[in-house]
Every structure is written in C-alpha cells, then in structure tokens.
Design a protein with these regions (language model features):
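Structural motif
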Residues: 6-10, 60-64, 85
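Glycine-rich, highly charged phosphate/nucleotide-binding loops
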Residues: 34-53
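Rossmann-fold NAD(P)-binding glycine/threonine-rich loop
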Residues: 69-76, 81-106
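N-terminal glycine-rich "phosphate-gripper" loop used for MgATP/nucleotide binding
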Residues: 56-71
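Glycine-rich adenosine-cofactor-binding loop
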Residues: 1-20
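NAD(P)-binding Rossmann-fold cofactor-contacting core
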Residues: 13-14, 21-40
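Active-site- and interface-proximal helix/loop "cap" or "latch" segments in soluble metabolic
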Residues: 113-120, 129-206
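Structured beta-strand/loop patches that form or line metal/cofactor-binding pockets in enzymes
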Residues: 95-127
Length: 206
C-alpha cells in the first residue's frame, strides 16, 4: 500500500517512525516535507503541493490550515482518501478523527487502517494480574505498543486506568489543544480510548 505523508517542520516524524516500526512493512511511505515559512493566510497553496498524488492513502500532518484544506481538495479531486487527525475538514473521502488513535475502522484506509487507529487489544491474566498483552491495532506513533508492555504484572482491576495513564506519557500530541466537542485535550482523549480498549479486552478475556 502506498501512503503519502505530508508534514511541516517534522510534524509527522513520530508517526512515521511508529508506522515503520509496527507496520510490519505493510506500507510504502513517501514523505512530503514543507519546511519553508508560510504567511498566516495562504491563497496559493497549490504552489507548495505536488501537481499529482501517486498514493492509495494520504496522511495529513500539515500545521497550516489553508495548506491542509488545499491538500484535501487535491485528494478529493483525485479520489484518494485522506486522514487528517484533529482537524475539521469537510471534503469527500477525508476522515478527521480527534486523534490518530481515535481513527475508526474504514475499508477505504486499507492495510493502514487495519493496523493503526483506535486501539484493539487481547490480554492474558492469571486471575489476579496481567500476564500478557497483544496489540492488534494501535496508535501510529507506536504509543499503544509501548504502553501495553508496561502494564504486565499490574493487578487486573488497575490495568485499564494504568494503560490510560501510560499512554499519556507516550503521546506526542499537543496537550494544550482542547477539543470542545469531546471536552478533552488530545492527550486525555488518547488516555480515554486506551482505557476503554483495555476494559473491552478484559471483558472478552473473562
């Protein structure tokens, strides 16, 4: 699967590192970095974007809202799905989850979407403590895998809360970005979805 990642000043580096590490070579990544200074209002965003996108999926990590919107237009015209976490873009084929780990399953996202997005876990216990955790689907930054390894040995009744706390230490999102719809910062949202994933996994294991 060909994935094109757009970033500004290293804004996607942690995600790309996680995808390469935990994607099991399922994805072919191409980076487009736009590191030049941009004006507050961008009228000619096309000048900074490729004329044609050769990809099955686009990941938008651009910081400039006008540039991200122009990229969304380009993807919509080309019929290429785009994931733009934390933004409010309304274009056909554009998905805007609150965080990268808030992405729901969508067949349009192909192999990437089956491996990365809202966390899905399986767990093993000895009746009292967590003895094993497998990540079936997790955050592209890799935080799900990191945090899951840290709760081995925790009491079952503390595991969900602990995972939520651990992921907040790993999360690379900006904690100052408050989402009025969800009533949480991206970091707190990440903690919430991981806690719920562990609760679901524990319910299934019993």
């Amino acid at each position: 699967m060909k994935i094109m990642v757009f970033q500004q000043n290293g804004s996607a580096e942690s995600k790309v590192e996680g995808i390469r590490r935990f994607g099991r070579d399922l994805c072919e990544l191409k980076m487009i970095s736009i590191d030049v200074p941009l004006p507050p209002v961008l009228d000619e965003g096309d000048a900074y974007l490729p004329a044609r996108i050769d990809a099955d999926l686009v990941l938008d990590h651009l910081k400039h809202p006008d540039l991200a919107l122009d990229l969304a237009h380009l993807c919509a015209q080309s019929g290429i799905p785009m994931i733009s976490s934390g933004k409010k873009i309304r274009e056909p084929g554009v998905t805007c989850p609150p965080t990268c780990c808030g992405l729901s399953r969508n067949s349009a996202h192909g192999i990437y979407g089956s491996r990365f997005g809202a966390p899905e876990l399986t767990v093993q216990t000895d009746g009292k403590k967590i003895t094993g955790v497998q990540v079936k689907r997790g955050a592209p930054c890799g935080g799900t895998w990191q945090a899951a390894g840290r709760i081995i040995g925790y009491p079952i009744d503390q595991a969900a809360v602990r995972l939520g706390l651990e992921i907040q230490y790993c999360c690379t999102a900006d904690p100052s970005d408050w989402d009025p719809i969800y009533g949480k910062s991206p970091v707190h949202f990440a903690g919430h979805v991981h806690r719920r994933a562990m609760e679901t996994a524990l319910a299934v294991s019993h």
